[in-house]
């Protein structure tokens, strides 16, 4: 075996972001602990980026190295994924694990990221705690005019991690437009790094 990639989702409510923290629980810590137990050896998982405290993630790519062999623990990555999901808490799930080339890196091979921001204007028990609730009418045209100003290619060095070693701080925000669905609005954005 060699380099493996996984795609995971998480409800970040109970976590202090993706990255391992010295005094707080993180998604990375939980995933590494469960994956290490499953694989039978200490395993470090590298994520495609970071998330802040309480942030949810969907289709978050991460990779790890594994030199073991399929056998008594699991027959293939599909079975390993199924077993790993049985070990993980309900707020973290892994969609898939698959082998990748040694040059593939979750963070440095990532070419694009997408974010969705949620706002809801009516009572919706499925969105409470996952979306900003607004109690007044919203001007969608004005919101989209403001969002259009986010679509540009420019310098984003103010948002980088200090000493993070980024190759570039130029970001190309390609899309930012609010859409309405029943009682909630979403702002899907995409950018290339």
Language-model features and meaning:
Residues 43-69, 104:
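Short, charge-patterned binding micro-sites
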Residues 24-34:
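Short catalytic helix/loop segments, enriched in acidic residues and glycine
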Residues 37-43, 88-93, 154:
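Short secondary-structure junctions
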């Amino acid at each position: 075996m060699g380099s493996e990639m996984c795609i995971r989702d998480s409800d970040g409510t109970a976590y202090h972001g993706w990255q391992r923290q010295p005094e707080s629980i993180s998604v990375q810590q939980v995933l590494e602990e469960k994956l290490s137990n499953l694989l039978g050896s200490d395993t470090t998982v590298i994520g495609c980026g970071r998330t802040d405290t309480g942030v949810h993630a969907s289709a978050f790519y991460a990779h790890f190295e594994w030199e073991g062999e399929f056998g008594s623990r699991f027959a293939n990555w599909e079975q390993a994924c199924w077993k790993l999901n049985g070990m993980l808490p309900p707020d973290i799930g892994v969609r898939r694990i698959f082998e990748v080339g040694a040059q593939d890196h979750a963070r440095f091979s990532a070419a694009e990221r997408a974010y969705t921001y949620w706002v809801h204007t009516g009572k919706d028990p499925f969105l409470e705690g996952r979306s900003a609730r607004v109690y007044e009418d919203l001007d969608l045209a004005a919101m989209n005019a403001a969002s259009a100003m986010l679509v540009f290619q420019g310098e984003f060095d103010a948002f980088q991690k200090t000493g993070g070693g980024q190759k570039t701080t130029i970001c190309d925000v390609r899309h930012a437009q609010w859409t309405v669905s029943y009682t909630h609005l979403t702002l899907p954005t995409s950018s290339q790094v």
